């Protein structure tokens, strides 16, 4: 039996709270069960040097975990003087996922940075971050339209992500920490509204997984992400 008696294909309760902080152009607290991530989107009237004069914008992301977001305190990466490989991998994943649903030409020469800070971690922090960051980004873009800076929202749609895996021989959706730490196979899937995939990260922690198991996991992810997309649309009133 899964934690909280969930079915194999059942996602955790999802809550998306918009306008969570005061200053950011887009601010969302996203909750996947006990995993909670704060996503703040900031708009700046500048672009990276490699995009100067290209008449297009940029979307990027940063990711971090608060020291006591886990069972025992972690040292802040700032105190260590460098970011870890996991952090850099995750924030690049978030940024790639967001850029997949933005018309960068329509954004103009602006940069939107989405800061994703994990307040509490219980598995699936990167997938929750992507799902919440998309809503924060949508709000930031909508503000540019409302303020008369842009004529149309550059968002081409929504993107969401979920974890799937094989635990005790069963394919399961939206893994909690206790499942993730014991999974034979762990996979993160990022998908846009029409079902196309942005990224699939899959690893066999023990026994290799079969082609049929891969297809089963992707089907589970598709079902779960559709529920997340529904939650995003409901939060945004779309």
Curated annotation (Swiss-Prot):
Phosphate binds at residues 86, 124-126. Keywords: Nucleotidyltransferase, RNA-binding, rRNA processing, Transferase, tRNA processing, tRNA-binding. One of its GO terms (biological process) is rRNA processing. It catalyses: tRNA(n+1) + phosphate = tRNA(n) + a ribonucleoside 5'-diphosphate. It is an enzyme of class 2 (transferase). GO terms for molecular function: 3'-5'-RNA exonuclease activity; tRNA binding; tRNA nucleotidyltransferase activity. Coiled coil: none annotated. The keyword Repeat does not apply. PROSITE patterns: RIBONUCLEASE_PH. Phosphorolytic 3'-5' exoribonuclease that plays an important role in tRNA 3'-end maturation. Removes nucleotide residues following the 3'-CCA terminus of tRNAs; can also add nucleotides to the ends of RNA molecules by using nucleoside diphosphates as substrates, but this may not be physiologically important. Probably plays a role in initiation of 16S rRNA degradation (leading to ribosome degradation) during starvation. This is Ribonuclease PH. It comes from Actinobacillus pleuropneumoniae serotype 7 (strain AP76). The gene is rph.
């Amino acid at each position: 039996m899964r934690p909280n008696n969930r079915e194999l294909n059942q996602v955790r309760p999802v809550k998306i709270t918009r306008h969570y902080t005061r200053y950011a152009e887009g601010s969302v607290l996203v909750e996947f069960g006990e995993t909670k991530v704060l996503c703040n989107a900031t708009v700046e009237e500048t672009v990276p040097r490699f995009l100067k004069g290209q008449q297009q914008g940029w979307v990027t992301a940063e990711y971090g975990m608060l020291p006591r977001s886990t069972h025992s305190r972690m040292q802040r990466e700032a105190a260590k003087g460098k970011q870890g490989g996991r952090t850099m991998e995750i924030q690049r994943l978030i940024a790639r996922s967001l850029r997949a649903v933005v018309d960068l030409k329509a954004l103009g020469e602006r940069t939107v940075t989405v800061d994703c800070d994990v307040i509490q971690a219980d598995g699936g922090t990167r997938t929750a971050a992507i799902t919440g960051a998309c809503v924060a980004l949508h709000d930031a873009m909508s503000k540019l339209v409302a303020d008369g800076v842009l004529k149309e929202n550059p968002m081409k749609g929504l993107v969401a992500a979920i974890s799937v895996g094989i635990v005790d021989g069963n394919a399961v959706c939206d893994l909690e920490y206790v499942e993730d730490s014991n999974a034979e196979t762990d996979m993160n899937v990022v998908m846009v509204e029409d079902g196309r995939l942005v990224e699939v990260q899959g690893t066999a922690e023990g026994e290799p997984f079969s082609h049929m198991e891969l297809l089963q996991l992707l089907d589970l992810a598709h079902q779960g992400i559709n529920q997340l997309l529904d939650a995003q649309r409901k939060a945004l009133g779309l």
